Design a protein with these regions (language model features):
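Active-site donor-binding segments of glycosyltransferases and PAPS-dependent sulfotransferases
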Residues: 29-101
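Membrane-proximal helix-turn-helix segments that form the acceptor-binding/catalytic region
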Residues: 131-162, 170
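Conserved donor-binding/catalytic core segment of Leloir-type glycosyltransferases
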Residues: 194-214, 220-228, 232-234
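Nucleotide-activated donor-binding/catalytic signature segment of Leloir-type glycosyltransferases, i.e.
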Residues: 241-265
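Acidic donor-binding loop of glycosyltransferase active sites
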Residues: 269-281, 294
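Short hydrophobic beta-strand element within catalytic cores of glycosyltransferases
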Residues: 295-299, 308
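Conserved acidic donor-binding segment of nucleotide-sugar-dependent glycosyltransferases
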Residues: 310-311, 315-322, 330-337
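A charged, aromatic-enriched C-terminal amphipathic alpha-helix characteristic of glycosyltransferases
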Residues: 320, 333-372
Length: 372
């Protein structure tokens, strides 16, 4: 069986890339051809996720500093994706949070899309992106978004089966595309993120990619107002340029930038709690933290409502404000969550083994129905 696998792009070893790796593990490496708009994986991630397999790319691969500026190429991404020739395959699987489902293929080839989210800048987060764009209030920006919405809906009609990464995204797929979908939660490395008998230390942790929507800067500002509480921040990304200034003069806040997986896991295992303030559609890192038996303080939004048991594995706070973060910290101080076994138990329902079985069963059933 010839399989094509399509990803928006490969530039960081994040949640979407971990899903890609778990799907690719299901199929014979030699039977799968991988497509992406560009591939700038570091060598370690290339071996972990792609097992060293090459990726067919677009001209964006040759744009200098593409990892930092790729979002500015959104207007041409649909056109570039359509230039991939995905003919002659028995099965096409895409994992998309942007344009990966927009390729052209034989209509008689089964097309399955694992959707992380409909394209955020033109749907649920349109107002946020427009407010931050210098032309966000212009007629041209509005016209461009309308064009992308029409293209996005049209490309969704070429998908035979949608898989949603959460109930939250299932609802958004229905709202944006008018399509039904099946929920299969992403795979979480619950074996790698293990419970540890090490003594918990008196610090809070904020970890992840440093991009604006993660709101890590807001968490830092919250702890600037709590000088008696220690915060450790781990992560890199194009949004980190202001972090040095934010933590200056705050001895209770430490920003470590990049750390290896081994170091990061140790920090998670020893933390009092980990804080997640982003609007996440699922949030794999939040589940990885719970797999270590560490409680989380997370925004009451999206995937966190499905992955956090409020009052058992963490506390949900209502709004993206510094005060809400501070209130959540105070609540944990007054009502500690120390049943680390129960916290880990909650994470085990999102294991990689569970994902591979659910995904394989879904594809097999879809192929039987489609090719009967």
């Amino acid at each position: 069986m010839k399989v094509a696998f399509v990803q928006d792009w490969f530039n960081a070893n994040g949640g979407a890339e971990k899903v890609a790796g778990a799907i690719l593990d299901i199929y014979d490496k030699d039977a799968v051809t991988i497509y992406a708009l560009f591939d700038r994986f570091p060598p370690s991630a290339r071996m972990e996720i792609l097992k060293g397999k090459p990726v067919k790319v677009s001209v964006l691969q040759y744009v200098p500093f593409i990892c930092k500026i790729y979002r500015y190429f959104l207007p041409v991404m649909p056109w570039l994706m359509k230039r991939f020739n995905l003919k002659g395959y028995d099965l096409i699987i895409s994992t998309s949070h942007a344009v990966a489902k927009g390729f052209r293929s034989d209509p008689g080839t089964l097309n399955i899309c694992y959707c992380h989210t409909p394209l955020r800048p033109i749907w649920d987060m349109y107002d946020d992106y427009a407010a931050s764009h210098p032309m966000g209030k212009s007629f041209l920006y509005s016209a461009f978004v309308n064009y992308l919405r029409k293209w996005d809906v049209a490309s969704s009609k070429r998908v035979h089966y949608f898989i949603a990464n959460s109930i939250h995204i299932q609802q958004r797929i229905k709202k944006s595309y008018g399509r039904e979908s099946t929920v299969i939660y992403p795979p979480v490395r619950v074996d790698k993120f293990a419970l540890n008998d090490a003594e918990r230390k008196d610090y809070y942790l904020c970890v992840g990619r440093v991009v604006p929507y993660k709101k890590m800067d807001m968490v830092i500002r919250a702890f600037r107002q709590m000088p008696d509480k220690k915060l450790i921040v781990i992560g890199t990304g194009w949004g980190a340029k202001d972090f040095n200034e934010l933590v200056k003069g705050c001895p209770n806040i430490e920003w470590y930038g990049y750390r290896s997986d081994e170091d990061m896991i140790r920090y998670i295992q020893e933390a009092r709690a980990c804080i997640f303030a982003a609007k996440e559609d699922f949030g794999i890192m939040c589940v990885e933290v719970q797999a270590c038996g560490t409680p989380v303080l997370a925004l009451d939004y999206g995937g966190y409502r499905e992955t956090v048991i409020d009052g058992v594995s963490g506390y949900l706070f209502p709004e993206q404000t510094e005060q809400c973060v501070a209130d959540a910290v105070t609540k944990l101080e007054q009502q500690p969550l120390n049943n680390h076994i129960a916290i880990r138990q909650n994470a085990l329902r999102f294991s990689e083994e569970r994902f591979r079985k659910e995904f394989s069963d879904f594809v097999q059933n879809a192929m039987k129905t489609f090719y009967k």
